Amino acid sequence: MENTENSVDSKSIKNSEPKIIHGSKSVDSGISLDNSYKMDYPEMGLCIIINNKNFHKSTGMASRSGTDVDAANLRETFMNLKYEVRNKNDLTREEIVELMRNVSKEDHSKRSSFVCVLLSHGEEGIIFGTNGPVDLKKITSFFRGDCCRSLTGKPKLFIIQACRGTELDCGIETDSGVDDDMACHKIPVEADFLYAYSTAPGYYSWRNSRDGSWFIQSLCAMLKQYAHKLEFMHILTRVNRKVATEFESSSFDATFHAKKQIPCIVSMLTKELYFYQ
């Protein structure tokens, strides 16, 4: 039988084995045009996937086995949603910043939205280039309303598969059963962002060497199933449940055995987001 490993997206951690627990639309469709983002521009938008697998020796960070599975899964998923997908592999921190700066300067006026996926090691508020850390704030700031005017008022989605600390979630038993155009001409520059983090602040984020990370597996599965049926926040809620209930780490090291994970969604979206009209 093929051996696979579960890892976490922090700078370093002992390996552990995986275990999965098995237990177009119009007003007539019920979508309010006043309360939902306009998604019928000529193009859906860009989806930038930054996939950092191999890191400079000086960083002391291990290779992220399984991340190529995530990148391929994401590419297929967002291409099916009609995004223009651009995959970038093993970027330094300088290259990440330069890429994001250049993308923000593009003309997005014919695009409905923007998606950026970051697959790497991380800490709270930080994503790692192959040669060192970058503040997430620096990456996302290029797309603020006052910096990227052609995306103003449009949804900007940042999906982040990375650790946010070194805490481990032991889980807890439960007996509940596992079952209009804007009237104002000014909007906050931080409006219309959504950050989908793979894990809660301070915690490890788990990744499987064969199947990819728990979070990206679940996100792609739920998007494939519900992208043409549900609003995006509802889809992300189902992602949270899938990660929380269907995955658990298995390790010979008791410290890393039977651990859980819950994604964390931070939304500054001002309207409902449907990937269909």
Swiss-Prot record:
<protein>
    <recommendedName>
        <fullName>Caspase-3</fullName>
        <ecNumber>3.4.22.56</ecNumber>
    </recommendedName>
</protein>
<feature type="modified residue" description="Phosphoserine">
    <location>
        <position position="26"/>
    </location>
</feature>
<dbReference type="InterPro" id="IPR029030">
    <property type="entry name" value="Caspase-like_dom_sf"/>
</dbReference>
<dbReference type="GO" id="GO:0005634">
    <property type="term" value="C:nucleus"/>
</dbReference>
<keyword id="KW-0007">Acetylation</keyword>
<dbReference type="GO" id="GO:0004197">
    <property type="term" value="F:cysteine-type endopeptidase activity"/>
</dbReference>
<keyword id="KW-0865">Zymogen</keyword>
<dbReference type="GO" id="GO:0140639">
    <property type="term" value="P:positive regulation of pyroptotic inflammatory response"/>
</dbReference>
<dbReference type="GO" id="GO:0030216">
    <property type="term" value="P:keratinocyte differentiation"/>
</dbReference>
<comment type="subunit">
    <text>Heterotetramer that consists of two anti-parallel arranged heterodimers, each one formed by a 17 kDa (p17) and a 12 kDa (p12) subunit. Interacts with BIRC6/bruce.</text>
</comment>
<dbReference type="GO" id="GO:0097193">
    <property type="term" value="P:intrinsic apoptotic signaling pathway"/>
</dbReference>
<dbReference type="GO" id="GO:0043525">
    <property type="term" value="P:positive regulation of neuron apoptotic process"/>
</dbReference>
<feature type="modified residue" description="N-acetylmethionine">
    <location>
        <position position="1"/>
    </location>
</feature>
<feature type="modified residue" description="N6-acetyllysine">
    <location>
        <position position="11"/>
    </location>
</feature>
<dbReference type="GO" id="GO:0031264">
    <property type="term" value="C:death-inducing signaling complex"/>
</dbReference>
<dbReference type="InterPro" id="IPR011600">
    <property type="entry name" value="Pept_C14_caspase"/>
</dbReference>
<keyword id="KW-0788">Thiol protease</keyword>
<feature type="compositionally biased region" description="Polar residues">
    <location>
        <begin position="1"/>
        <end position="10"/>
    </location>
</feature>
<comment type="function">
    <text>Involved in the activation cascade of caspases responsible for apoptosis execution. At the onset of apoptosis, it proteolytically cleaves poly(ADP-ribose) polymerase PARP1 at a '216-Asp-|-Gly-217' bond. Cleaves and activates sterol regulatory element binding proteins (SREBPs) between the basic helix-loop-helix leucine zipper domain and the membrane attachment domain. Cleaves and activates caspase-6, -7 and -9 (CASP6, CASP7 and CASP9, respectively). Cleaves and inactivates interleukin-18 (IL18). Triggers cell adhesion in sympathetic neurons through RET cleavage.</text>
</comment>
<dbReference type="GO" id="GO:0001818">
    <property type="term" value="P:negative regulation of cytokine production"/>
</dbReference>
<keyword id="KW-0597">Phosphoprotein</keyword>
<dbReference type="GO" id="GO:0048011">
    <property type="term" value="P:neurotrophin TRK receptor signaling pathway"/>
</dbReference>
<dbReference type="GO" id="GO:0006508">
    <property type="term" value="P:proteolysis"/>
</dbReference>
<dbReference type="GO" id="GO:0016485">
    <property type="term" value="P:protein processing"/>
</dbReference>
<dbReference type="GO" id="GO:0031647">
    <property type="term" value="P:regulation of protein stability"/>
</dbReference>
<dbReference type="GO" id="GO:0004175">
    <property type="term" value="F:endopeptidase activity"/>
</dbReference>
<keyword id="KW-0702">S-nitrosylation</keyword>
<dbReference type="GO" id="GO:0072734">
    <property type="term" value="P:cellular response to staurosporine"/>
</dbReference>
<dbReference type="InterPro" id="IPR001309">
    <property type="entry name" value="Pept_C14_p20"/>
</dbReference>
<feature type="active site">
    <location>
        <position position="121"/>
    </location>
</feature>
<feature type="modified residue" description="S-nitrosocysteine; in inhibited form">
    <location>
        <position position="163"/>
    </location>
</feature>
<dbReference type="GO" id="GO:0030182">
    <property type="term" value="P:neuron differentiation"/>
</dbReference>
<dbReference type="InterPro" id="IPR002138">
    <property type="entry name" value="Pept_C14_p10"/>
</dbReference>
<dbReference type="InterPro" id="IPR015917">
    <property type="entry name" value="Pept_C14A"/>
</dbReference>
<feature type="propeptide">
    <location>
        <begin position="10"/>
        <end position="28"/>
    </location>
</feature>
<dbReference type="Pfam" id="PF00656">
    <property type="entry name" value="Peptidase_C14"/>
</dbReference>
<feature type="region of interest" description="Disordered">
    <location>
        <begin position="1"/>
        <end position="25"/>
    </location>
</feature>
<dbReference type="GO" id="GO:0097194">
    <property type="term" value="P:execution phase of apoptosis"/>
</dbReference>
<dbReference type="GO" id="GO:0030218">
    <property type="term" value="P:erythrocyte differentiation"/>
</dbReference>
<dbReference type="GO" id="GO:0070269">
    <property type="term" value="P:pyroptotic inflammatory response"/>
</dbReference>
<keyword id="KW-0832">Ubl conjugation</keyword>
<feature type="compositionally biased region" description="Basic and acidic residues">
    <location>
        <begin position="11"/>
        <end position="20"/>
    </location>
</feature>
